[in-house]
Amino acid sequence: MKALVIGAGGVGRAIANIASRRPFISSMVIADRHLVRAEEAVARVKDSRFSAAQVNAAELEDIRELIRRADPDVVI
């Protein structure tokens, strides 16, 4: 399953941590307004299935574009 998590704060980091222990997650993009924050969340899980992206969640078109690029099965 390909997943996209919007927000790399406490909840986003917790989701990434749990997902890193689930073999059915084939890839997960952690996105945040601040790319550094998303990159830090990815670095914490130390898993090549995870990647970081930048998105302004207040802009619907930004979210749509990220969904097109990431092609996730689920968006959180």
PLM region descriptions:
Residues 50-52:
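Hydrophobic/aromatic anchor residues within beta-strands of the central parallel beta-sheet
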Residues 33-37:
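Helix N-cap at the beta1-alpha1 junction of Rossmann-like dinucleotide-binding domains, i.e.
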Residues 54-72, 76:
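Conserved Rossmann-fold cofactor-binding substructure of NAD(P)-dependent oxidoreductases
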Residues 3-9:
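Conserved N-terminal Rossmann-fold NAD(P)-binding element of oxidoreductases
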